[in-house]
Amino acid sequence: LSYTEDSDGQILEEGITESGSMASFIAAGTSYATRGVPMIPFYTFYSMFGFQRTGDLIWQAADIRARGFMMGATAGRTTLLGEGLQHQDGHSLVLASTVPTVQAFDPAFAYEVGAIVRAGIEQMYGPDSPESERDVIYYLTLYNENYPMPALPEDAALAEEFRSGAVRGMYRFAAAPEGPSRRATILFSGVAHSAARKAVEELAEHYDVGAELWSVTNYKRLREQAMATERYNRLHPSAKRETALVTSLLSESTGPITAVTDFMCAVPEQIGRYVPTGRPFKVLGTDGMGRSDTRESLRRHFEVDCGHVVVSTLEGLADLGEVDRSLVADAIARYDIDPDAVDPFLV
């Protein structure tokens, strides 16, 4: 690791010692209270060996009101190719969802990471942040797959919508292509954007379906906001009913909804009951053990590649009666999907 020493910063390269590293994170993350010296630790680690290996220490950090950033590097079940089941993380976001003060983000693009980090620092130490909301830990998944990073839109208002959407949990990344007569919605997180974006092209070209794309950076935050809305409505029966943010945003979209992630299906399913009524909600995730193979083979094995996104979207349209189920069978054949393959969860 190459770095430059500086009098106003510090880097600790601790090696394979997750418990020791968490101790350092806690010390730095609580120094605002114990020493009156605000610090903002960024702890970067193999995402598989964070919440799974040092969960007790992360809970302790939350309990004693630590502030800082945990960076789950080499994230995703299919992204760390060739490393096998001991290193391929498809569930740190599930474990992170159990810690109340952790905000668990799964960004896809560089501008999302930048917006999230800025928002986190402002929440922890910004002058306009309420005291009751300062004691938080931001967990960000970071992948090791290289791909071109899209720029923010040139329109300033739209660029701000992208940034604020990344922080609140989701935003519309791309409108449905013009031309197709049928409509659908695809949600992606992290590296799953590639399968989602390719599926949009395939659906438009071969199946007369225009799918809009939404980037979902934080299912946990969306769920918690929706739960707070439910609680308010329950305890204020005479007040005007409020609508959960995720329900309101998805109401702006059309058609069946497919969510694709490089993590377990349990991550997108956090918002399942808040999807607008009457909209089929399909989830593609990487439940099961990791295995050593290429990214392409792993994504086919876990059924989260482009072909499976297309099939899932068409199934949702068939559920609504908008297409015949023979079209689903056509897509299964087109993308050479084996319908009798063993469930990846069982392998």
Short names for language-model regions:
Residues 59-77:
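A glycine-rich helix N-cap at a beta->alpha junction
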Residues 24-36, 59-65, 95-99, 271-274:
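Alpha-helix C-terminal capping segments
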Residues 21-25, 41-45, 53-57, 61, ...:
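Extended, hydrophobic alpha-helical segments in both membrane/secreted and soluble proteins
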Residues 39, 65-69, 100-102, 255:
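Short glycine-/polar-rich loops that comprise or flank the Walker A/P-loop
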Residues 14-32, 267, 309:
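Conserved phosphate/anionic-ligand binding catalytic regions in large, soluble enzymes, centered on
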Residues 1-15, 37-41, 179-182, 290-291:
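Glycine/charged-rich beta-loop-alpha catalytic/anionic-binding loops adjacent to active sites
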Residues 4-22, 43-51, 71-75, 81, ...:
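Active-site nucleophile and cofactor-binding loops and adjacent substrate-binding regions
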Residues 34, 74-87, 91, 97, ...:
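Thiamine diphosphate
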